[in-house]
Amino acid sequence: MDRKYLANAIRALSMDGVQQANSGHPGAPMGMADIAEVLWRSHLNHNPSNPEWADRDRFVLSNGHGSMLIYSLLHLSGYELSIDDLKNFRQLHSKTPGHPEYGYAPGIETTTGPLGQGITNAVGMAMAEKALAAQFNKEGHDIVDHFTYVFMGDGCLMEGISHEACSLAGTLGLGKLIAFWDDNGISIDGHVEGWFSDDTPKRFEAYGWHVIPAVDGHDADAINAAIEAAKADPRPTLICTKTIIGFGSPNKSGSHDCHGAPLGAEEIAATRKELGWEHGPFEIPQEVYAEWSAKETGAAKEAAWNEKFAAYEAAYPELAAEFKRRVNGELPAEWEEKASQIIADLQANPANIASRKASQNALEAFGALLPEFMGGSADLAPSNLTMWSGSKSLEANDFSGNYIHYGVREFGMTAIMNGIALHGGFVPYGATFLMFMEYARNAMRMAALMKIQNIQVYTHDSIGLGEDGPTHQPVEQIASLRLTPNMNTWRPCDQVESAVAWKLAIERKDAPTALIFSRQNLAQQPRSAEQVADIAKGGYILKDSEGKPELILIATGSEVELAVKAAEQLTAEGKKVRVVSMPSTDAFDKQDADYREAVLPSDVTARIAIEAGIADFWYKYVGFDGRIIGMTTFGESAPADQLFEMFGFTVENVVNTAKELLA
């Protein structure tokens, strides 16, 4: 059957889906249909009957607005995505939301839409493939051997994150990464020459990529030859495909008119005529389905891989068991027992250290149990303390390690980690200063939206970093992380809370975690075994009064020590004071009402929250009758002790505030 005719099935479904929804982006799917047909029918190794097959090729639609392209491909190939699902494009609770979302339709490898993040996720997937291959493959047994393919448009290339990711991909020699640039010269505002005149091929050559320029995106033979050349090259490849946006539309192709709006009934009829597509809306002939179906070939490819894996399992039974455990996202059998013992030992052996150092100690202890750890930092390893004795850096010619030097690429790092998590086989963690999570915020939001694991170590968490000043001192960042749905945020007060936070982050597979650590040393707090267990609840009674409290001090991180000292002074003066350590407000909020009431009794309205972050966040816990000792402005450049005094983080100020409240 004519390849163009098979590609036209994508064009028809895409324009019909957008028309039915009365919103969407038909131009990119219609322009890239020929490329998609060649890639999916002649190259992509996948099995529609098992979208989770470990050694499948990954496909990422980085220009996620063209979502009808991937929905059409999944439907035509035989995935569990019906024609009714396509008719429900962009409708409430459908499997086909406006941008592709991970966890809705089978075969969607990542959520895309915020431009540039798809290509960056793909870099992470390609890194995970290369690292897993280095760790598990043996001579004659290539059980990890797959490609990551990406479609991306001009918008992805304009976004700065594409530079961060593609630069690193070239440095690390990710030869299994193949990207297709949809070079149609059109963005929402019109022809891109006025705002995007880069020499993109030269840009990627400078990154160390293999570049195939000037491929006719509507010539199946040229596309096929380019893919074959890309697969044979040891470098990541950019295939520059010249396409016509809205291909087939007689009056709107080649213009921004077809980028982000339905073609309209009249133009769709004209397009059907132009393409020689004589079938009605959402009608696909059986012979077209038969040509497109990947069920039989996909099952055969997976069966062949299963045979390879059986041979590997016979030769390397322990490695095979470890591979299965890791790709299934399971922790080692001895994890719970050993991790809990590590925490108990820390409580029994107090140390007054910075929580960033406590974090490194947790990595040292837990890392020995977790070969799946894949760490990293955005060029701040000596400050974030993210390397431990078992850390081994990934290098282009040796990917058997477990640590990535991301360079100064906070956004790229975080979105790459999303790709690593989505690929499977690793527990990724990265790091930067808390202030610079701002650069990476949207990628962490995407992790929360996708319900995937992404552990970020954010150090230098307050004015406590001192002399570097307000450019580096976070104020509103902790609150913004806490306010992000499905984000775990922890600000521990000592080495024990730090280890508990790390343990929970490692165990939590369905959400990202922000671990917020101090630069300065923090005093370890005494606790009973029950209190240690209660840390996981996010908030707990650290020090209590004799009888019912008349005042509750709530604190996090470096301010817990301050709250304890103030409570001791107030208690000595006859006040009944409870200290609540609340390292994770979101974990505390998830506890049942009885527990929350036991910790923060509603009839004790005299409450003070103490945190070197934005003050307004804490009204939810202290009420309008309470007080907050927090930040209401940016910081200053000065030694940390002077700043804490200037902004009121002193025992004297807490005590005086308490007395005013109780007066």
Swiss-Prot record:
Thiamine diphosphate binds at residues 65, 113-115, 155, 184, 259, 436. Its EC number is 2.2.1.1. The keyword Transmembrane helix does not apply. One of its GO terms (biological process) is pentose-phosphate shunt. Substrate binds at residues 25, 259, 356, 383, 460, 468, 519. Its cofactor is Mg(2+); Ca(2+); Mn(2+); Co(2+). GO terms for molecular function: metal ion binding; transketolase activity. The active site is at 410 (proton donor). Disulfide bonds: none annotated. It comes from the Bacteria. It catalyses: D-sedoheptulose 7-phosphate + D-glyceraldehyde 3-phosphate = aldehydo-D-ribose 5-phosphate + D-xylulose 5-phosphate. The record marks 25, 259 as: Important for catalytic activity. GO terms for cellular component: cytosol. The keyword Magnesium applies. Binds 1 Mg(2+) ion per subunit. Can also utilize other divalent metal cations, such as Ca(2+), Mn(2+) and Co(2+). InterPro entries: THDP-binding (IPR029061), Transketo_C/PFOR_II (IPR009014), Transketolase-like_C_2 (IPR055152), Transketolase-like_Pyr-bd (IPR005475), Transketolase_bac-like (IPR005478), Transketolase_BS (IPR020826), Transketolase_CS (IPR049557), Transketolase_fam (IPR033247). Homodimer. Belongs to the transketolase family. PANTHER family: TRANSKETOLASE (PTHR43522), TRANSKETOLASE 1-RELATED (PTHR43522:SF2). This is Transketolase 2. It comes from Vibrio parahaemolyticus serotype O3:K6 (strain RIMD 2210633). The gene is tkt2.
